[in-house]
């Protein structure tokens, strides 16, 4: 009799546990590391003396900013990468950045040297980009400070233009723990020749 009673209770628990609809479990998302590998534009050899003895070369990267857009090309966030997180390689830089995990596509604009060399102030007007802003409008709104307001003088102009601002765009079809962005190519957005 005890065995039938125990079997009956077990069957009742079994039916009770199966009768509840399974709740849809959403994956737990948060910030995860994404490795980014950047290929720098190679300088062309020119038979003039440009920035001789200057503190920067045409390929120096002192900091980077990632502008993250969603699958609908709407701005989401800006992620800063400081100099101490950049690893220089023979042809570029590598760094790891923390981004929100997602199964959806992300469009990423990488702006190198968009801040001062020490990373304390913006050289581009990133503050004009607001969440939800369309990619085309956001990117076309970025500008450097006008040279009209820069004092005359070689060192001041050099500080204003160097290191060169460089730009790259890439897309990730989802972000998870194995996501890598390799071979991101940068273009110089300015040129500077000092005579």
Predicted features along the sequence, with ranges:
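Bacterial lipoprotein signal-peptidase II cleavage site
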Residues: 19-25
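Short, low-hydrophobicity acidic/polar segments
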Residues: 27, 31-194
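C-terminal motif of bacterial Sec signal peptides marking the signal peptidase cleavage site
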Residues: 14-17
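Positively charged n-region of N-terminal signal peptides that target proteins for export
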Residues: 1-5
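Sec-dependent N-terminal signal peptides
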Residues: 6-10
């Amino acid at each position: 009799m005890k065995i039938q009673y125990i079997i009956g209770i077990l069957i009742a628990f079994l039916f009770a546990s199966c009768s509840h609809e399974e709740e849809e479990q959403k994956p737990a998302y948060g910030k995860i590391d994404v490795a980014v590998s950047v290929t720098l534009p190679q300088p062309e050899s020119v038979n003039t003396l440009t920035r001789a003895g200057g503190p920067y070369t045409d390929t120096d990267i002192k900091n980077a900013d990632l502008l993250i857009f969603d699958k609908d090309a709407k701005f989401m966030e800006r992620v800063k990468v400081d100099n101490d997180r950049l690893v220089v390689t023979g042809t570029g830089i590598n760094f790891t950045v923390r981004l929100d995990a997602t199964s959806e596509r992300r469009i990423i604009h990488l702006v190198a040297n968009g801040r001062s060399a020490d990373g304390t102030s913006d050289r581009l007007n990133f503050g004009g980009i607001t969440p939800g802003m369309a990619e085309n409008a956001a990117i076309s709104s970025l500008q450097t400070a006008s040279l009209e307001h820069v004092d005359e003088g070689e060192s001041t102009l050099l500080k204003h233009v160097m290191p060169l601002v460089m730009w790259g765009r890439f897309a990730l079809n989802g972000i998870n723990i194995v996501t890598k962005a390799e071979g991101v190519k940068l273009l110089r957005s300015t040129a500077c020749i000092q005579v």
